[in-house]
Swiss-Prot record:
Keywords: Acetylation, Coiled coil, Endosome, Golgi apparatus, Membrane, Phosphoprotein, Protein transport, Transmembrane, Transmembrane helix, Transport. This is Syntaxin-12. CDD domains: SNARE_syntaxin12 (cd15876), SynN (cd00179). Residues 272-274 are vesicular. Associates with the BLOC-1 complex. Interacts with BLOC1S6. Interacts with NAPA and SNAP23. Identified in a complex containing STX6, STX12, VAMP4 and VTI1A. Interacts with GRIPAP1. Forms a complex with GRIP1, GRIA2 and NSG1; controls the intracellular fate of AMPAR and the endosomal sorting of the GRIA2 subunit toward recycling and membrane targeting. Interacts with NSG1. Interacts with TPC1. Interacts (via N-terminus) with VPS13B. Belongs to the syntaxin family. Residues 2-250 are cytoplasmic. The chain crosses the membrane at residues 251-271. Residues 1-20, 128-150 are annotated as: Disordered. GO terms for molecular function: SNAP receptor activity; SNARE binding. PROSITE patterns: SYNTAXIN (PS00914), T_SNARE (PS50192). One of its GO terms (cellular component) is synaptic vesicle.
Length: 274
Protein backbone atom coordinates (compact mmCIF):
# COMPACT_ATOMS: atom_id res chain seq x y z
CA UNK A 1 0.00 0.00 0.00
CA UNK A 2 1.36 3.44 -0.91
CA UNK A 3 1.21 6.45 1.32
CA UNK A 4 1.33 9.88 -0.27
CA UNK A 5 1.64 13.35 1.18
CA UNK A 6 -1.35 15.26 2.43
CA UNK A 7 -1.60 17.55 -0.62
CA UNK A 8 -5.05 16.16 -1.41
CA UNK A 9 -6.31 17.59 1.88
CA UNK A 10 -4.88 21.07 1.43
CA UNK A 11 -6.85 24.01 0.14
CA UNK A 12 -6.70 24.27 -3.67
CA UNK A 13 -5.77 27.48 -5.42
CA UNK A 14 -2.96 30.00 -5.07
CA UNK A 15 -1.69 31.05 -1.70
CA UNK A 16 -2.70 34.47 -0.41
CA UNK A 17 -4.90 36.24 2.13
CA UNK A 18 -8.05 34.49 3.25
CA UNK A 19 -11.37 35.64 1.75
CA UNK A 20 -13.16 38.29 3.73
CA UNK A 21 -16.77 37.99 2.62
CA UNK A 22 -19.30 35.78 4.38
CA UNK A 23 -20.06 33.32 1.55
CA UNK A 24 -16.39 32.71 0.68
CA UNK A 25 -15.48 32.01 4.30
CA UNK A 26 -18.44 29.63 4.63
CA UNK A 27 -17.33 27.79 1.50
CA UNK A 28 -13.70 27.56 2.65
CA UNK A 29 -14.69 26.29 6.11
CA UNK A 30 -17.03 23.68 4.62
CA UNK A 31 -14.22 22.40 2.39
CA UNK A 32 -11.81 22.28 5.34
CA UNK A 33 -14.28 20.32 7.46
CA UNK A 34 -14.73 17.79 4.66
CA UNK A 35 -10.94 17.39 4.33
CA UNK A 36 -10.60 16.95 8.10
CA UNK A 37 -13.11 14.09 7.98
CA UNK A 38 -11.33 12.47 5.03
CA UNK A 39 -7.93 12.79 6.70
CA UNK A 40 -9.30 11.35 9.95
CA UNK A 41 -10.45 8.25 8.05
CA UNK A 42 -6.98 7.91 6.49
CA UNK A 43 -5.27 8.31 9.88
CA UNK A 44 -7.55 5.61 11.29
CA UNK A 45 -6.54 3.29 8.45
CA UNK A 46 -2.82 3.90 9.04
CA UNK A 47 -3.28 3.49 12.79
CA UNK A 48 -4.71 -0.01 12.29
CA UNK A 49 -1.34 -1.08 10.83
CA UNK A 50 0.72 -0.01 13.85
CA UNK A 51 2.31 -3.01 15.57
CA UNK A 52 1.72 -5.27 12.53
CA UNK A 53 4.00 -6.47 9.73
CA UNK A 54 3.07 -3.33 7.78
CA UNK A 55 4.50 -1.12 10.54
CA UNK A 56 7.52 0.78 9.25
CA UNK A 57 9.34 4.09 9.44
CA UNK A 58 7.52 5.17 6.27
CA UNK A 59 4.14 4.41 7.84
CA UNK A 60 5.17 6.33 10.96
CA UNK A 61 6.25 9.29 8.85
CA UNK A 62 2.99 9.38 6.88
CA UNK A 63 0.90 8.93 10.00
CA UNK A 64 2.65 11.82 11.71
CA UNK A 65 2.32 13.99 8.59
CA UNK A 66 -1.40 13.26 8.19
CA UNK A 67 -2.30 14.00 11.79
CA UNK A 68 -0.14 17.13 12.04
CA UNK A 69 -1.43 18.56 8.73
CA UNK A 70 -5.00 17.82 9.79
CA UNK A 71 -4.33 19.61 13.05
CA UNK A 72 -3.12 22.68 11.11
CA UNK A 73 -6.25 22.51 8.96
CA UNK A 74 -8.40 22.51 12.11
CA UNK A 75 -6.54 25.55 13.46
CA UNK A 76 -7.04 27.37 10.16
CA UNK A 77 -10.76 26.61 10.22
CA UNK A 78 -10.97 27.86 13.80
CA UNK A 79 -9.41 31.19 12.79
CA UNK A 80 -11.81 31.49 9.84
CA UNK A 81 -14.77 30.93 12.15
CA UNK A 82 -13.49 33.69 14.43
CA UNK A 83 -13.21 35.97 11.41
CA UNK A 84 -16.73 34.98 10.39
CA UNK A 85 -18.04 36.09 13.76
CA UNK A 86 -16.38 39.50 13.40
CA UNK A 87 -18.07 40.35 10.09
CA UNK A 88 -20.79 43.04 10.23
CA UNK A 89 -24.37 41.80 10.16
CA UNK A 90 -26.55 42.46 7.12
CA UNK A 91 -29.29 45.06 7.52
CA UNK A 92 -32.09 42.71 6.51
CA UNK A 93 -33.56 40.62 9.34
CA UNK A 94 -34.18 37.71 6.94
CA UNK A 95 -30.52 37.73 5.85
CA UNK A 96 -29.45 37.79 9.50
CA UNK A 97 -31.55 34.69 10.16
CA UNK A 98 -30.11 32.93 7.10
CA UNK A 99 -26.53 33.67 8.14
CA UNK A 100 -27.32 32.54 11.67
CA UNK A 101 -28.54 29.16 10.40
CA UNK A 102 -25.48 28.75 8.16
CA UNK A 103 -23.09 29.49 11.03
CA UNK A 104 -24.96 27.12 13.36
CA UNK A 105 -24.76 24.28 10.83
CA UNK A 106 -21.08 25.01 10.12
CA UNK A 107 -20.08 25.01 13.80
CA UNK A 108 -22.00 21.78 14.43
CA UNK A 109 -20.25 20.08 11.49
CA UNK A 110 -16.85 21.38 12.64
CA UNK A 111 -17.45 20.22 16.21
CA UNK A 112 -18.39 16.73 15.01
CA UNK A 113 -15.37 16.43 12.67
CA UNK A 114 -13.06 17.78 15.37
CA UNK A 115 -14.38 15.31 17.94
CA UNK A 116 -13.80 12.35 15.60
CA UNK A 117 -10.29 13.60 14.84
CA UNK A 118 -9.41 13.94 18.52
CA UNK A 119 -10.69 10.43 19.30
CA UNK A 120 -8.39 9.01 16.61
CA UNK A 121 -5.50 11.18 17.86
CA UNK A 122 -5.81 9.71 21.35
CA UNK A 123 -5.95 6.16 19.98
CA UNK A 124 -2.81 6.77 17.92
CA UNK A 125 -1.05 8.09 21.02
CA UNK A 126 -2.05 5.00 23.00
CA UNK A 127 -0.84 2.61 20.28
CA UNK A 128 2.45 4.48 19.94
CA UNK A 129 3.05 4.25 23.69
CA UNK A 130 2.29 0.52 23.61
CA UNK A 131 4.75 0.11 20.73
CA UNK A 132 7.47 1.92 22.67
CA UNK A 133 6.82 -0.23 25.74
CA UNK A 134 7.18 -3.40 23.64
CA UNK A 135 10.41 -2.12 22.07
CA UNK A 136 11.88 -1.29 25.47
CA UNK A 137 10.90 -4.71 26.80
CA UNK A 138 12.52 -6.37 23.77
CA UNK A 139 15.76 -4.43 24.32
CA UNK A 140 15.88 -5.48 27.97
CA UNK A 141 15.31 -9.14 27.04
CA UNK A 142 18.15 -9.00 24.51
CA UNK A 143 20.53 -7.62 27.15
CA UNK A 144 19.46 -10.28 29.68
CA UNK A 145 19.96 -13.09 27.15
CA UNK A 146 23.45 -11.81 26.35
CA UNK A 147 24.43 -11.74 30.04
CA UNK A 148 23.03 -15.25 30.56
CA UNK A 149 25.10 -16.61 27.67
CA UNK A 150 28.25 -14.99 29.07
CA UNK A 151 27.69 -16.74 32.42
CA UNK A 152 26.79 -20.23 31.13
CA UNK A 153 29.06 -20.73 28.12
CA UNK A 154 32.83 -21.40 28.44
CA UNK A 155 34.83 -20.79 25.26
CA UNK A 156 38.38 -20.72 23.88
CA UNK A 157 40.02 -17.71 22.29
CA UNK A 158 38.40 -18.35 18.88
CA UNK A 159 34.98 -18.70 20.43
CA UNK A 160 35.64 -15.61 22.53
CA UNK A 161 36.33 -13.62 19.36
CA UNK A 162 33.09 -14.83 17.79
CA UNK A 163 31.22 -13.95 20.98
CA UNK A 164 32.65 -10.43 20.93
CA UNK A 165 31.55 -10.05 17.31
CA UNK A 166 28.07 -11.29 18.21
CA UNK A 167 27.86 -8.87 21.13
CA UNK A 168 28.84 -5.96 18.87
CA UNK A 169 26.07 -6.90 16.42
CA UNK A 170 23.54 -7.17 19.23
CA UNK A 171 24.69 -3.83 20.62
CA UNK A 172 24.26 -2.25 17.18
CA UNK A 173 20.74 -3.65 16.88
CA UNK A 174 19.87 -2.42 20.37
CA UNK A 175 21.20 1.04 19.53
CA UNK A 176 19.05 1.09 16.40
CA UNK A 177 16.02 0.09 18.45
CA UNK A 178 16.74 2.84 20.94
CA UNK A 179 17.02 5.37 18.12
CA UNK A 180 13.64 4.23 16.81
CA UNK A 181 12.21 4.55 20.31
CA UNK A 182 13.51 8.11 20.54
CA UNK A 183 11.90 8.96 17.20
CA UNK A 184 8.57 7.56 18.35
CA UNK A 185 8.79 9.40 21.65
CA UNK A 186 9.37 12.65 19.73
CA UNK A 187 6.38 11.84 17.53
CA UNK A 188 4.25 11.23 20.63
CA UNK A 189 5.29 14.58 22.10
CA UNK A 190 4.24 16.31 18.88
CA UNK A 191 0.99 14.35 18.85
CA UNK A 192 0.18 15.31 22.43
CA UNK A 193 0.96 18.96 21.61
CA UNK A 194 -1.48 18.72 18.69
CA UNK A 195 -4.09 17.18 21.00
CA UNK A 196 -3.70 20.20 23.30
CA UNK A 197 -4.20 22.45 20.26
CA UNK A 198 -7.45 20.65 19.48
CA UNK A 199 -8.55 21.08 23.10
CA UNK A 200 -7.99 24.84 22.75
CA UNK A 201 -9.97 24.84 19.50
CA UNK A 202 -12.85 23.15 21.34
CA UNK A 203 -12.73 25.92 23.97
CA UNK A 204 -12.76 28.61 21.27
CA UNK A 205 -15.62 26.84 19.51
CA UNK A 206 -17.63 26.66 22.73
CA UNK A 207 -17.12 30.40 23.21
CA UNK A 208 -18.20 31.11 19.63
CA UNK A 209 -21.32 28.97 20.07
CA UNK A 210 -22.10 30.91 23.26
CA UNK A 211 -21.61 34.22 21.44
CA UNK A 212 -23.72 32.89 18.58
CA UNK A 213 -26.51 32.24 21.09
CA UNK A 214 -26.24 35.82 22.36
CA UNK A 215 -26.33 37.02 18.77
CA UNK A 216 -29.43 34.94 18.08
CA UNK A 217 -31.13 36.45 21.14
CA UNK A 218 -30.16 39.91 19.91
CA UNK A 219 -31.50 39.23 16.42
CA UNK A 220 -34.76 37.86 17.81
CA UNK A 221 -35.05 40.84 20.15
CA UNK A 222 -34.47 43.22 17.24
CA UNK A 223 -37.06 41.39 15.16
CA UNK A 224 -39.57 41.51 18.02
CA UNK A 225 -38.77 45.19 18.58
CA UNK A 226 -39.30 45.90 14.89
CA UNK A 227 -42.62 44.08 14.97
CA UNK A 228 -43.68 46.09 18.02
CA UNK A 229 -42.68 49.31 16.30
CA UNK A 230 -44.60 48.32 13.19
CA UNK A 231 -47.67 47.52 15.28
CA UNK A 232 -47.38 50.84 17.12
CA UNK A 233 -46.96 52.72 13.86
CA UNK A 234 -50.02 50.96 12.46
CA UNK A 235 -52.06 51.89 15.54
CA UNK A 236 -50.91 55.47 15.27
CA UNK A 237 -51.85 55.61 11.60
CA UNK A 238 -55.29 54.19 12.36
CA UNK A 239 -55.77 56.74 15.13
CA UNK A 240 -54.59 59.55 12.87
CA UNK A 241 -57.01 58.44 10.17
CA UNK A 242 -59.83 58.28 12.74
CA UNK A 243 -59.06 61.76 14.08
CA UNK A 244 -58.71 63.11 10.56
CA UNK A 245 -62.08 61.65 9.59
CA UNK A 246 -63.65 63.02 12.76
CA UNK A 247 -62.09 66.43 12.12
CA UNK A 248 -63.46 66.47 8.58
CA UNK A 249 -66.91 65.65 9.86
CA UNK A 250 -66.74 68.53 12.33
CA UNK A 251 -65.59 70.86 9.59
CA UNK A 252 -68.50 69.82 7.38
CA UNK A 253 -70.99 70.47 10.19
CA UNK A 254 -69.37 73.82 10.96
CA UNK A 255 -69.49 74.85 7.29
CA UNK A 256 -73.13 73.79 7.10
CA UNK A 257 -74.03 75.79 10.22
CA UNK A 258 -72.18 78.83 8.91
CA UNK A 259 -73.98 78.48 5.59
CA UNK A 260 -77.35 78.43 7.34
CA UNK A 261 -76.42 81.46 9.45
CA UNK A 262 -75.23 83.39 6.39
CA UNK A 263 -78.40 82.48 4.51
CA UNK A 264 -80.58 83.67 7.41
CA UNK A 265 -78.61 86.91 7.66
CA UNK A 266 -78.96 87.53 3.94
CA UNK A 267 -82.72 86.94 4.10
CA UNK A 268 -83.08 89.24 7.14
CA UNK A 269 -81.07 92.00 5.48
CA UNK A 270 -83.02 91.62 2.26
CA UNK A 271 -86.39 91.85 4.10
CA UNK A 272 -85.23 94.83 6.17
CA UNK A 273 -84.10 96.70 3.09
CA UNK A 274 -87.65 96.59 1.71
Amino acid sequence: MSYGPLDMYRNPGPSGPQPRDFNSIIQTCSGNIQRISQATAQIKNLMSQLGTKQDSSKLQENLQQFQHSTNQLAKETNELLKELGSLPLPLSASEQRQQKLQKERLMNDFSSALNNFQVVQRKVSEKEKESIARARAGSRLSAEDRQREEQLVSFDSHEEWNQMQSQEEEAAITEQDLELIKERETAIQQLEADILDVNQIFKDLAMMIHDQGDLIDSIEANVESSEVHVERASDQLQRAAYYQKKSRKKMCILVLVLSVIVTVLVVVIWVASK
